[in-house]
């Protein structure tokens, strides 16, 4: 092994050894998942550096050598820093023979407000290109989902006052009551989903339900759009209301059809399993089936076990208080219905 004199904590060294054993022994594959869910991202980054120092091999290359198929793709995503993962997903979706519209929708419509600037900056550093320009150039503005993600990629979320909320309440009601998809009404939805803060959107949600006999904004979105447009606007609605809702919705869509969409399962899981502690609860509440039962039906082997395990609520252990550098906005999301 390379660089045997490399100094590191016993804890990190033990994690590296556990990764090596899990890759080499198929019966220990789920240890890779336990590591990902049990340590915060900054400690995983430290582990990757230690892994290279001890073994002389990049962790990504080692994982690719020993793992395969959907499980390999999932683990590779889990061990990447979140900002890097988001940038790589966007880059992969916009380069090549065609645009991966589903990936762009999943990523850009489920990024937290405090992350947007960091993602824009990192994307430029990695690829010497503007995130907004890339998305706009690749997707155009012909489709409503494209207009929405363009607005999210280039816009900012700004707090509203009570008067602005009341004005938008009128506009939203008009959009829902209007038959057919009209330009002005679509613009209203896009502006709200792309520029509202979560707190203001929840307030608008409550105001709408109170004023219109319990009617739901989400039902209005469902009646308004179809296909990928419907998915995108529902996802934007759910993520603003509670990321747990968005995760459960997206996972349910990934399970639908003749075969599960493992690409969507992987990216939604890797992006949100840490923060969305209420996903399984919400899934059962809305879709009427336990999440683990659906996984057992749709997914096979260690891959299915990994997906189930990652969405199980867990308290991430911090080795020291110095490892926690976030403020309230970075704390794990809890379900609020």
Curated annotation (Swiss-Prot):
Belongs to the annexin family. One of its GO terms (biological process) is cell projection organization. It comes from the Eukaryota. GO terms for cellular component: cytoplasm; motile cilium; plasma membrane. One of its GO terms (molecular function) is phosphatidylserine binding. It comes from Giardia intestinalis (Giardia lamblia). Annexin repeats lie at residues 10-80, 81-154, 161-238, 242-312. InterPro entries: Annexin (IPR001464), Annexin_repeat (IPR018502), Annexin_sf (IPR037104). May function as a calcium-regulated structural element linking phospholipid bilayer and underlying axoneme. The lineage of its organism: Eukaryota, Metamonada, Diplomonadida, Hexamitidae, Giardiinae. The keyword Repeat applies. This is Annexin E1. Its main location: other. Transmembrane segments: none annotated. It is found in: Cell projection, Cilium, Flagellum. Pfam families: Annexin, ANXE1_4th. Keywords: Annexin, Calcium, Calcium/phospholipid-binding, Cell projection, Cilium, Cilium biogenesis/degradation, Flagellum, Repeat.
């Amino acid at each position: 092994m390379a660089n045997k004199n490399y100094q590191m904590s016993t804890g990190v060294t033990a994690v590296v050894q556990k990764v090596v054993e899990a890759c080499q022994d198929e019966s220990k594959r789920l240890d890779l998942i336990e590591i990902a869910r049990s340590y915060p991202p900054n400690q995983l980054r430290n582990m990757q550096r230690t892994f290279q120092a001890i073994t002389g091999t990049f962790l990504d290359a080692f994982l690719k050598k020993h793992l395969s198929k959907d499980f390999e793709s999932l683990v590779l995503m889990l061990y990447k820093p979140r900002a890097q993962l988001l940038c790589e997903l966007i880059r992969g979706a916009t380069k090549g023979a065609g645009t991966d519209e589903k990936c762009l929708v999943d990523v850009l419509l489920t990024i937290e407000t405090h992350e947007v600037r960091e993602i824009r900056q990192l994307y430029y550093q990695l690829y010497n290109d503007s995130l907004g320009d890339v998305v706009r150039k690749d997707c155009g503005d012909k489709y409503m989902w494209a207009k929405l993600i363009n607005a999210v990629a280039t816009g900012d979320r700004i707090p509203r006052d009570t008067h602005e909320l009341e004005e938008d309440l009128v506009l939203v009601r008009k959009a829902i009551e209007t038959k057919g998809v009209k330009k002005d009404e679509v613009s209203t939805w896009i502006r709200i989903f792309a520029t509202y803060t979560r707190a203001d959107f929840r307030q608008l949600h409550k105001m709408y339900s109170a004023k219109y006999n319990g009617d739901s904004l989400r039902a209005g979105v469902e009646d308004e759009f179809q296909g990928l447009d419907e998915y995108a606007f529902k996802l934007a609605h759910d993520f603003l209301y509670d990321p747990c809702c968005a995760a459960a919705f997206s996972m349910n869509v990934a399970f639908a059809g003749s075969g599960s969409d493992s690409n969507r399962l992987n990216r939604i899981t890797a992006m949100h399993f840490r923060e969305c502690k209420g996903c399984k609860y919400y899934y059962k509440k809305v879709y009427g089936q336990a999440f683990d039962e659906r996984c057992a039906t749709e997914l096979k082997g260690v891959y299915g076990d990994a997906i189930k395990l990652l969405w199980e609520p867990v308290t991430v252990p911090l080795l020291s208080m110095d490892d926690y550098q976030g403020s309230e906005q970075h704390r794990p999301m809890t379900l609020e219905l």
